[in-house]
């Protein structure tokens, strides 16, 4: 009989400063960081409102003047807009009057935004346009004479874009966006975003687990051919393929994983070790979902590139995705898959990208297992705040990068995380 999962509850001792990483190389991670409300709140200030650039949109989502999109930086609601002069703007979706969310639509086009509560209105850059009855009426008093609309706009974020990816930050101290992305990561972003894109749509899902468990997951090539039967059985991602597992050199928080077929038989190791994720008896009725149209100098079957803290760039065969991670508390996050193609795609290639969208997303043949795994970790660790994970794979050769049998990217991530959080 299948067990019913108990509700997740937070660890009893909840002090954000009471977090101890026993090793400084990221190989031991206290489970408290996945369930503590205090740690989560500290992350909102030190990471999402700290010296990071947060992915908020694809420029292709807001191509025209007045286009807007509601999203989040961490758990702070923000709106990203295209201004009348074609520039990008982002502001906190919180009215300067009494704090209500101003914009209640997920996306659209508007020349201004009006708060439903008291009808204060703002332009696309967050500047206050109007206050009803500001000067009173028929002798009744209004706002004080010294009320200055210029001082009561919406809180603005700094915005920049790289190759059509839009990022926002609360910080005045963060490095310029190209430097933040880093010299090692930019060429891999350029690989995918080398020409204008077309936005195809998105899927959304929630996972009852901590957002960092997903960040671990996308930095973990070791799991990819163990957990995912589809990956391994249909030769999309296997041990033995040409591989890269590269962290960024600045802080270790970004990374790139790629695999490419070489023509060698990579199934033998799975057969010999009787690994569950390889199943020769598993067949597809329509194998066209596995078609691979050559588009790049190297036709990787898998390109997974986390850009900390909210973005994962993905290419699996010909499906292209910008995954957006939105924390919703210590034990919940929203995951949005933004699907895109290139503006000059043929109708046939566009149709293939849409078909291959079934590989990922909430019911994807591959990715549905990832959030199931992160929820299992969440449920398994919630009552053992002081216990730690063991992240040892390839620790004896941490600089090796031509392998997927490694947890080096996860260790680098945790080292960078500790520095940001002050642990």
Swiss-Prot record:
Domain Rieske residue range list: 53-168
Cofactor: binding details: Binds 1 Fe cation per subunit.
Biological process annotations from GO: catabolic process
Catalytic activity as recorded in UniProt: anthranilate + NADH + O2 + 3 H(+) = catechol + NH4(+) + CO2 + NAD(+); anthranilate + NADPH + O2 + 3 H(+) = catechol + NH4(+) + CO2 + NADP(+)
Entry keyword set: 2Fe-2S, Aromatic hydrocarbons catabolism, Dioxygenase, Iron, Iron-sulfur, Metal-binding, NAD, Oxidoreductase
Keyword Manganese applies: no
Cofactor field: Fe cation; [2Fe-2S] cluster
Protein name, UniProt field: Anthranilate 1,2-dioxygenase large subunit
The organism of origin for this protein: Burkholderia cepacia (Pseudomonas cepacia)
Gene assigned in the entry: andAc
